[in-house]
Amino acid sequence: MIVIPAIDLIDGKCVRLTQGDYSQVQLFNSDPIEQAKLFEKSGAKYVHVVDLDGAKVGRPVNFEVIRNIKRVTSLTVECGGGIRDKATVELYISSGVNYIILGSVIFKNPDFVNEVMKVFGKERFIASLDFKDGFVKLSGWQEATTITIEEGIMKIKTLGFERLIYTDITTDGMLKGHNFEAAKYIRELFDGFLTASGGISTKEDIMRLKSIGVDAAVVGKALYTGQLKLEEVINLL
């Protein structure tokens, strides 16, 4: 079980949203590179970076920040947000990013997904499944769909993804615990490397996910508010 600290970027700064709402932005560190170094110092081996500006507009906005995180740390970097064409994938991979997270394009442009997986290798890609009230949401969580969780996972499996990260938007940034029923359900449907995200705020949450068979947990706001100490959680596992 791996604990992955999260860095969400808006205007080059490290922020957290509440339930994916862009009008509820909390600034936690104006220097995300410094934040990544702090995570590394605390024992993290991975970092989960999302370009929230990019997710909204459909192209990379905070690329330089992400490239510098990779340059100045030895962290394994997984990043997403607005990655919707081959040139952007190429840009991130050439900067040393280890994993590319694809979300909206899985449903909007599966041909593109097939192409980049063929060119760069499917092991470089993580599928992102974001949902609210049982239905998938796209475009930085701004766009509702009628796609169910099960239909979303079937699509992800058909495309050949070996890694999946899911987020229940209702729990994200709320510090009120994770949707464990969804965790069990998704674990049954997907047998690849599974990462949980959304509302993970206690050591108990992490141990419960581990017992369900989840492979990794992305933790955000709980680390920034001090509710969870990264060193303690890493030592726990």
Curated annotation (Swiss-Prot):
Location within or outside the cell: Cytoplasm
Pathways involved: Amino-acid biosynthesis; L-histidine biosynthesis; L-histidine from 5-phospho-alpha-D-ribose 1-diphosphate: step 4/9
A molecular function GO annotation: 1-(5-phosphoribosyl)-5-[(5-phosphoribosylamino)methylideneamino]imidazole-4-carboxamide isomerase activity
Q: Which residues form the signal peptide?
A: none
* Reaction equations catalysed: 1-(5-phospho-beta-D-ribosyl)-5-[(5-phospho-beta-D-ribosylamino)methylideneamino]imidazole-4-carboxamide = 5-[(5-phospho-1-deoxy-D-ribulos-1-ylimino)methylamino]-1-(5-phospho-beta-D-ribosyl)imidazole-4-carboxamide
Q: What is its EC number?
A: 5.3.1.16
Q: Name one GO cellular component term.
A: cytoplasm
The organism named in the record is: Caldicellulosiruptor bescii (strain ATCC BAA-1888 / DSM 6725 / KCTC 15123 / Z-1320)
UniProt keyword terms in alphabetical order: Amino-acid biosynthesis, Cytoplasm, Histidine biosynthesis, Isomerase
Is 4Fe-4S one of the keywords UniProt gives this record?
no
**Pfam families given in the database record:** His_biosynth
Domain of life, source organism: Bacteria
What is the phylogenetic placement of the source species in the record? Bacteria, Bacillati, Bacillota, Bacillota incertae sedis, Caldicellulosiruptorales
Q: What is its main location?
A: cytoplasm
Its recorded name reads 1-(5-phosphoribosyl)-5-[(5-phosphoribosylamino)methylideneamino] imidazole-4-carboxamide isomerase
Which residues catalyse the reaction? 8 (proton acceptor), 130 (proton donor)
Family of the protein in this entry: Belongs to the HisA/HisF family.
Q: Which cysteines are joined by disulfide bonds?
A: none
Q: Which InterPro entries match?
A: Aldolase_TIM, His_biosynth, HisA_bact_arch, Isoase_HisA-like, Isoase_HisA-like_bact, RibuloseP-bd_barrel
One GO BP on record is: L-tryptophan biosynthetic process
